[in-house]
Amino acid sequence: MEMRRFYILILAAVALLAGCDSVGSDERLIEIPPATVQRNVLIEDFTGQRCIFCPAASQTIEELQKLYGADRLIAVGIHAGPLAIKSMGGVKGLRTDAGDVYYKYWAVPNVPKAIINRRGGVLPKDTWAGRIYEEFAQTTTINIALQCHYDAATRQVKIETNLKTLSEDVKGRLQLWLVEDSVVAPQLFPNNKMDKEYVHNHVFRAAINGEWGTELTLSSMRTHVEQTTYTLPEGVVPGNAWIVGFVYNDSGVLQVVRQKVSLS
């Protein structure tokens, strides 16, 4: 009896399959997700050597970089505004004219503040982690490859930037920045404590191709190549220097990468 019931179930299943409308291979809808590449995140950290709360903000960024990786969460410390200082009278200052341009353009009210992927406005420290998490959840179709060739005799670095989009054409700008790690310079702490040998990392040094970069249009049909030759400013240590490159437009930063200037 059990065997007979089994055969009846098999026959019923065959009948159901025979009643299904066959779909040809050329009629099936196959959803193909859009191609994407690994998304990195840029945090522009507005800071100053006379800002007593800025060292703690820098520590927060370092902890977030340990979580995500320093090549994925790319930090740039922009010394600007009234609490930043320029070099004078034997005191090493990290403030730059380009940094002041950004400080004014983004209407930074005070420091420490940050802009993350140039979306969401100027943010206080306690919101950084959440905003960074949200940005990593986004996707991008932009691929950037940076190559640096440094000549110690001339202090010139040749920068080759290869860019491509995996989808429709993208209009934007390529920005190249010089950033330096392990910069020893004074820093003020709470209770007006001054550390004259404080080590500053990811310090913004210069906008290599101008404050707002180079206008370009990326196509999925070809790789866009930019060649740039730049002379390192006096005082910048080649072994501590990085080139940060990113593509941005009105929607924010689409992709960011970094590359060491010299591996020696």
Language model region names:
Residues 33-81:
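Local sequence-structure signature of Cys/Sec-based thiol-disulfide redox active-site neighborhoods
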Residues 2-5, 14-42, 46, 52:
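Bacterial Sec-dependent N-terminal signal peptides
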Residues 20-24, 57-58, 190-191:
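Short N-terminal helix-initiation segments at or just after the protein's N-terminus
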Residues 28-30, 61-66, 102, 130-135:
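Intrinsically disordered, low-complexity boundary segments flanking structured domains
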Residues 71, 77-264:
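Short, conserved sequence motifs used for protein processing/export or organelle targeting and
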